[in-house]
Amino acid sequence: MPALLTCTDGSAYAPSLYQHTAWAAARMGGSVEVLHVYPAAPPFFIPPVNFMGDPSMGSASLALPELTAVSEAQEREAKLAAETLLQEAATRLAAAGVAHPVLTALPGTLPQVLEAWEKPFDLLLLGKRGDSTAAQRQALGSQLETIIRQSSRPVLVVSHDFKPIERFLISFDDSPSAHAALRQVVEGPLLRGLPCGVMMAGDPTGENRETLDSACTYLKTGGFDAAEFLMQGDPETVSTWEIEAHHFDLLVMGAYSHSRFLQFFIGSTTTEMIRTCRIPVLVMGGQMPHLHPGG
């Protein structure tokens, strides 16, 4: 059975995150685990003790239990908050049709926890902005780019508001990662049966038209109703126009391309498109095995 891992910190994106999780779980026929990562207790400094009769030894020995008590209290408080947050997630998921999600709370940072994560999963879901960036308009979650870069599984970055996903747009530049994204779309259950568009940003040359036509033919052979869009202009401008003009609900792209188009998403300017995009973004990792429906 496919597995979904939803990462939450209870930010303003959480309600949308849980609805997107329920949508994806229904599409994939998968199980859901909800992960909340809370800050680890800060380490405290133990002053060196002079065992040759230094009077400071007594104060150091008294400080240690006090610091330990503070650290333990902070940890208890963080665990209690995590439990409350996860129960809220379970309640919202149940209302959306997801029964009995696994609830997990771990200390550390989200990139650290995910890097050490051993249980297999097929889709990672998280909000565009976390609780620490909620007050900053259009700020991007500080850990998001790190997570996308290190993930070998697809990452669904959800928008603030949930809208049923009925049409999706694939960014395509003929790179290996773009071809991998096409293959994963065709082979996996997540987007099966939904109409889509394939967009290239470039001049209307015969070569570009042939490349785009080949990508659409591949999708059509896989059972998708695919439309072609070859547009001149900056990739970011073109993609925004296409999304709004044709009412797409999801943007799909490959990760780690060195092309100008996908460098706009993943690279030195990764944050810009995800920051400004008003619809969910599904980033396909190049190392991901395809998703298996029902197994």
List PLM regions with ranges.
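Aromatic/hydrophobic pocket-lining residues that form π-stacking "cages" and hydrophobic walls in ligand
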Residues: 21, 89, 114, 185, ...
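Gly/Ser-rich helix-loop-strand patches that form or flank binding pockets
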Residues: 13-27, 103-162, 242-295
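A structural preference for short, hydrophobic beta-strand core positions in alpha/beta folds
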Residues: 34, 102-105, 157, 198, ...
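Alpha-helix-centered segments that form part of catalytic cores
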Residues: 67-91, 101
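A short helix-to-beta-strand connector/capping loop
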Residues: 94-102, 220-227
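A short, acidic, amphipathic alpha-helical segment used as a generic capping/interface helix at domain edges
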Residues: 216, 234-244
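Conserved active-site histidine-acidic residue motif and adjacent donor-binding/catalytic loop
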Residues: 108-111, 231-237
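Small/aliphatic-rich secondary-structure junction motif
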Residues: 1-68, 150, 163-230, 248
